[in-house]
A protein has these predicted regions:
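N-terminal Sec-pathway targeting helices
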Residues: 1-15, 19
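Hydrophobic alpha-helical transmembrane segments and immediately flanking/interface helices
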Residues: 10-12, 23, 77-83
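Transmembrane signal-anchor/signal-peptide helices with a preference for the extracytoplasmic
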Residues: 15-39
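Ser/Thr-centered flexible coil motifs
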Residues: 33, 90, 116-119
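Short extracytoplasmic/periplasmic juxtamembrane "stem" segments immediately C-terminal to an N-terminal membrane anchor
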Residues: 33-51
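Alpha-helical segments in soluble extracytoplasmic regions
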Residues: 50-108, 122-154
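Cytosolic/nucleoplasmic, non-transmembrane interface domains of endomembrane
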Residues: 113-125
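Short acidic DE-rich linear segments
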Residues: 155-160
Length: 160
């Protein structure tokens, strides 16, 4: 009887530790995923301010804008892959990210070489992108949130 009681106590303690670990791990994954979303929105704000800076300085270093667009694409990909791998992304969120990814596929790609010259048409598209980012809520001195509902609304505003 005494051995049975000891086994029950050990089993209860083990289960408490296991549930605590699972809860902590789930909380940690949610926080990490939220930080990725917040980081992507930070990249969008930096892209807006980089376009503004280049526009004010006669596009003297347009590769910086292309690098920022690449950062946004990588952020979208990282958020999507991480969300799928840890099972934290809903189908609606995945669709939002695909919409955003397709939207940014329409802009020039960073080649890795610092001598890329943008055509006037590309510059005009980027200026329009800056305006669209600001109107969606991603811009310098504009606040943004890490909750997905706000993020999703901004994606819809940007892509429509």
């Amino acid at each position: 009887m005494k051995t049975k009681n000891i086994m029950i106590v050990i089993s209860i303690l083990f289960n408490v530790v296991l549930f605590t670990y699972i809860y902590w791990r789930e909380s940690h994954l949610k926080e990490m995923y939220s930080n990725l979303s917040f980081g992507l929105q930070g990249d969008l704000v930096q892209l807006e301010s980089t376009i503004e800076y280049q526009n004010n300085n006669k596009w003297n270093d347009e590769n910086v804008v292309l690098e920022k667009i690449e950062d946004v694409r990588e952020g979208i990909h990282q958020l999507m892959v991480t969300g799928i791998n840890v099972g934290m992304i809903t189908k609606s969120q995945e669709n939002d990210l695909w919409t955003l990814y397709r939207y940014f596929a329409n802009f020039p790609t960073y080649t890795g070489f610092p001598n890329t010259k943008l055509e006037n048409n590309d510059i005009n598209k980027l200026i329009r992108l800056r305006d669209d980012l600001r109107s969606a809520g991603w811009g310098t001195n504009l606040g943004y949130s890490s909750d997905w509902a706000s993020f999703s609304m901004k994606i819809e505003d940007l892509t429509n």
